[in-house]
């Protein structure tokens, strides 16, 4: 329910109730009181500047800066007049009303009001409540006409002030008393926010898609309501005493778009939400959780002994009930309170993971930063928040009626310029560094040359002391030891709907005795530093190189030069790292008649040189190199710069780095195993827990290495990438300027005869830079991953293996020591220990960062290098090749059919010329009984012939084989079985098979693509995995030596059905046994894509006929119901006999996906991608084309979809968005409809009512659109069975009915 928010004018009279004179704890002197307004119970606004801990001169920009990393906005005159204070008050009230307009904001405010700080703190005797302490109360002056003023205490939860010295610095905190912080110790405290609603931070638009043009990044300004909600989340943490104080966390990643990389407080990461909390290690996460749990228990213990109160009017029983409700304690029959672990867990997750900036941004339709580390641009200011044509309570800046909702255009600086104004430069301060080197000029005699550099432009290297030391700690393992992991998911819907999170209390009287003990308060001290720091350097850094590529805006007759010093000393010269040919061409003066051809030549040369890349022979895990990076940024020494490619091949990725960081790889702390004499169960659990904790050690070590890599290595690589963008942009601007200068030399008559579009020049140059940046992205990403995998992970694995060896010894000794009690379990436990500790735990980058680009590069690294692929078939440029690097050659028969869409599929028919032979290198032949290997491929086999099912089930035919002298291996098919067979030199064979059902209504395998991976441990088992999951395992130890041919044959052999065929793709052989994690990862890598799939697993296509299949209601199809122009459902028919069963699929309406006019699909193919905007047409209702429409003015949660001839009736809407909400690999997709501010919902099958004026009709199980699904898809329960999941079925030769 909405909370009650009061409205005020600043000049309203004092009433000693909700308008008072408040003595702030930031009191600058005795007797100072500020006018305060209670807009919500226990929440007050004080329209005054925040001065607590600050000196008066610190409010001026000229005295330096507080922070090295952000723009600081100063205006000492702000909030000085009553008019400004009135505007501040009314603006804050409007922001609170905006927050109060959504259920999630209502719940946030409700919980803040109810979360009354504990009456006391660490200095309060445990058996007492104390109201007149600094973390609970504040003083107010009671003003009564004709009477002496009185001072009373006032208990509050939150006081909001205007900004401190820096208007762009919003901040939330409370009191530190005698070295203790109640907001971090479970007590909670009265919170204070310093806030400036009129100052808006500005951030870059961030696209996760690697292919997004760098020039499409836009600047967006914040919605002050979301900024305020961010601070209110801090308030909620503080009121519950779980606010995390002074715990800096090393940044997760320094992406291309990220700016500030210093360690960030954990409190900010939790409050922001999204992916940011993932940077916090599981052990740190658990330590924070356990501290909060212990603090809650301490509060419960205090409540159990409280018997008196300091301060009048304190009802002890009432406050005990208040705190029982607040902390969700349980009470036993004796009235004793304690923490229920499940209740605490729920409350903690709601507070830490439910209320986050990212969650709330989604609820309110507000654009926010992608990450807390995102780049900030100079802030802006607005004086128009009270103007409802600029900023509304329900929509903020993104006002639909002004066409500002789409793509958050209301927050887009370039679009909504009337909403803000720029801040004048004299009010903005940023920390800068002057990098100076001695130099002497002949003419001026200057003795130094300085380049001004912003602090955030420097390379960031995290301090080694900021990394966790937890790995080195010894641990005691007991039978009840738990893992250090926390589930950090809590949806915003749970917050809104969960009544357990609402205390429902009646607020107690807030008046108390005045607070007098100011000596207990620790007043903070804030120190400024100079805004400019000068440092001297000996040589030229990349900053000199970048500066030499810039030029003053008013310069004329600009020229390019290959000399750095020439450019630094002459303002009309720009340093270029491209060839002398480009320099000479650009500097050539040409006549007007040659101008157009000259421009084309300059641009062509720039395109050719900027997009150049070379391949590398000696560094196998880096596939390309950008040779001009060295001379562009002064990377490497002088020799390396001049021949960057050779230097890179010798020195590897390390030569790109400014600093080689010191890597911290601690010795892993040992385990002490708890002794349990005679207790068999406890002994076994202790062993099991030790193995689980061992796995956690591996995870934590990898996490530590990734944390160091991201913040000491990857940050350098990404800084290089960003500088290369700057460098290329500098080159482009210089060329544009040179072209402009050349054009301006001509007479007006000559200009009239020159046909040239300068916008086209700009476009072509930017297009070249985009292509170049994509190449640089690939190169830099590969370098970073290479450094991680070659220089860092091996060191970690060595330490972990040493730990495993010691743990194995200790566990086996522990088993022997307890042999008497374990009896027949001894050998089983020893085998378990040996098996568990035999293998390393594979490193998976996706567990430690959400950076999709880095994960993609890592996955490529894993699949192409670490997995030891010795044969990998790919279809490129119209031919089949081996992309493993081992150079197998191919013979392809004339009756093999290729489909280059979908990873190079090929079709084998049952004919003599439908065959492929891959001739392998002799270096990869396996002819030893001890050689392990794996094969992996995808297959699609057609449906059986209904009339000849016995032949289908009995005929076994080979599809892939590698046989030499009757020894080797083969893959064969026998009906619904996939069979793997190994044959040794003595003709002894061993087979393992996977069998799927042919009696399911809807099969997951018949005519559908599925992945098969077979792994072979010659001293152990052969395993068959289907779609990444282990299905069967058989021992192959008794086989003798196996010959393998140099040739791998793909051909249907011994197949009796002449019409039979199979499709195969993604075939790989690996030179070792892949483990389960690698198989699962390989399946994920191969199947993950932004293209959507049809029912069979092929790419979904535009302009193709499809029948619809509903995953939630599989036994129905959709047909046309003409009476109401809608889709109704009918049951699918089955074909069923003793051997087989299946449902008919080609039933009902036939749909065609069409590109919508505003589709984001910019590819030239006809593939449907996730997020595309589409129309959904129907071609079998009548002779004319029909389309699916949504009624624009519908107010129903769930309503019909209209099927009507294509028209432009404004009462209907037809633009849809095709989505894929689940990360799990699935062929399902969802169809969303939104228009302006309205979300209609997702397509589904549901029930709704239609009003015909004279009668109501109820329609059940009809084609509908529903908002209900949007909530359900965010939950984890059976989401794949929801009725909003659709698959598109094309007619296919492999499925006949």
UniProtKB/Swiss-Prot annotation:
What reactions does this protein catalyze? Answer: Limited hydrolysis of proteins of the neuroexocytosis apparatus, synaptobrevins, SNAP25 or syntaxin. No detected action on small molecule substrates
Q: Cofactor(s) for this protein?
A: Zn(2+)
Alphabetical GO CC annotations of the entry are: extracellular region; host cell cytoplasmic vesicle; host cell cytosol; host cell plasma membrane; host cell presynaptic membrane; membrane
Signal peptide (from-to): none
Alphabetical list of PROSITE patterns matching this protein = ZINC_PROTEASE
User: What Enzyme Commission number(s) apply to this enzyme?
Assistant: 3.4.24.69
Keywords, in A-Z order:
Disulfide bond, Host cell membrane, Host cytoplasm, Host cytoplasmic vesicle, Host membrane, Host synapse, Hydrolase, Lipid-binding, Membrane, Metal-binding, Metalloprotease, Neurotoxin, Protease, Secreted, Toxin, Virulence, Zinc
Disulfide-bonded cysteine pairs: these are: 436-450
What is the additional note? There are seven antigenically distinct forms of botulinum neurotoxin: Types A, B, C, D, E, F, and G; new subtypes are quite frequent. Botulism poisoning is usually food-borne, either by ingesting toxin or bacterial-contaminated food, or less frequently by inhalation poisoning. In both cases the neurotoxin binds to the apical surface of epithelial cells in the gut or airway. Toxin undergoes receptor-mediated endocytosis (using a different receptor than on target nerve cells), transcytosis across the epithelial cells and release into the general circulation. Once in the general circulation it binds to its target cells.
Q: How does it assemble?
A: Heterodimer; disulfide-linked heterodimer of a light chain (LC) and a heavy chain (HC). The LC has the proteolytic/pharmacological activity, while the N- and C-termini of the HC mediate channel formation and toxin binding, respectively. Interacts with host receptors synaptotagmin-1 and -2 (SYT1 and SYT2).
Name of the featured protein? Botulinum neurotoxin type G
- Organism encoding this protein: Clostridium botulinum
Its gene?
botG
